[in-house]
Regions:
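Conserved catalytic cores of phosphodiester-cleaving nucleases, focusing on short active-site segments
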Residues: 37-39, 46-60
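Mg2+/Mn2+-dependent nuclease catalytic core
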Residues: 58-78, 82
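Beta-rich catalytic cores
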Residues: 33
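Acidic-basic catalytic patches of nuclease active cores, encompassing PD-(D/E)XK
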Residues: 1-29, 42
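Charged phosphate-binding loop/patch that engages nucleotide di/tri-phosphates or the phosphate backbone
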Residues: 120-142
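Nucleic-acid nuclease catalytic cores
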Residues: 80-110
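Short, electropositive alpha-helical surface patch
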Residues: 101-128
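A generic structural motif
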Residues: 40-42, 94
């Protein structure tokens, strides 16, 4: 049985940064839109930050549009409610080009259909070949 793309992405993330932060995978079938992970990330300043993380695997279309097959509007609604309450959340989107997009939760409604040539301000890209400190710094910078 083959793994789903998001499962493989989770396994990569856990191997890439798991020893440098706290990651808890959430398997919630009750709360609509609850993200896939809860993480606590230590910044270079020594301050820990808690962030909810939605994992997605996506492909760029030939027109340069991001296609996220498992995108659900109620997930974006969750991020919007969480942001209004003062929380921080992100989307980590693995693309077919070997990059990971780090998208602030405030842009959750724009994830599916995002244009590569006109990324919204605040979206960061990191290579899957990056080391843990670089990945964590990019996550915390969003």
């Amino acid at each position: 049985m083959s793994r789903k793309p998001e499962q493989a992405f989770w396994e990569w993330l856990r191997r890439a940064i798991g020893k440098n932060c706290y990651l808890e995978r959430i398997e919630n079938r009750v709360g609509m839109g609850t993200p896939d992970l809860h993480g606590v990330f230590m910044g270079a300043d020594g301050i820990s930050r808690a962030i909810w993380v939605e994992l997605k695997s996506a492909q760029w279309s030939t027109q340069g549009t991001l296609r996220v097959p498992a995108y659900k509007p109620h997930q974006a609604a969750w991020h919007e409610r969480y942001l209004k309450a003062g929380g921080k959340s992100i989307y980590l989107v693995e693309t077919d080009t070997g990059e990971v997009l780090i998208i602030p939760g405030r842009l959750a409604g724009q994830v599916d259909g995002m244009m590569k040539a006109a990324m919204p301000q605040g979206v960061t890209t990191v290579s899957k070949k990056a080391k843990a400190p670089e990945i964590i710094a990019a996550i915390l910078a969003v």
